[in-house]
């Protein structure tokens, strides 16, 4: 029986987000730096496109629907002088994100402001356009609209509002459902690499769910789409830094294999979070964590190996044992 415990005891600490402005020298350019828009200025423009930014009244309604139905005292004090229709940014979000609603049907949305010429906007537009948008391998967060404001060199990515709480309040999921979630993570990686896109920030914190069995990648601030054969990235920084980048003083020789390493770490962290230590799954990650990136499998090879592995694991209906 393979030793299924070793990766959980040796996972590197998960550092905080570095943001796009700390990638390489190209990310120092304004086009790929983080946008901090004055949201009230774009309120009318977004309304014309059918989207409404959250107001004080929206926040109050959220609290009224909570378990105790009461609006917290700190919120009332903070917004004591505000009108109900004043904008109400979520203090837990960075300045480039804002919650809102699609006016046609009440769908809750997340809006992200980016530079019009940013790599992130180009990647999102590519992944969210037909035929890629409709490809079943594509597990990018559903994008409802892309609003461009050319005079300000800014764009708004309008996404469905999913949850970063990967395990629902109702409790843990079965092993079969856990495998289904992991497969979506692997499949989207294979899909991106097929189209010469490296995500470059694969981690649990960049994974969301709609609690309907769907999981999606977010945060393409560091992502790159490669047209040629030269793919090295100098001064590479990300959430999960592979060993070759540390050995090369931050240079990333193969972004695609860096994604593979980060995906292995995501899988092991997900196992720990969900309470599953499956020896077959641990074995799957071993080659993904090879120190030499050239020795790591491709995303498509990982997906194929995963699909062959799942039928060999018994009792997919079982629940995790946290004891």
Regions found by a protein language model. Name each.
Residues 292-295, 301-315:
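Terminal C-lobe "cap" of eukaryotic-type protein kinase domains
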Residues 285-292:
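Short C-terminal capping segment of an alpha-helix within the protein kinase catalytic domain
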Residues 59-146:
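ATP-binding glycine-rich loop module of kinase domains
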Residues 22, 316-323:
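Regulatory extensions appended to serine/threonine kinase catalytic cores
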Residues 2-91:
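Juxta-kinase regulatory segment immediately upstream of eukaryotic protein kinase catalytic domains
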Residues 211-283:
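C-lobe/activation-segment region of protein kinase-like
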Residues 189-212, 217:
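Catalytic-loop of the protein kinase fold
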Residues 135-182:
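Conserved structural core of kinase catalytic domains
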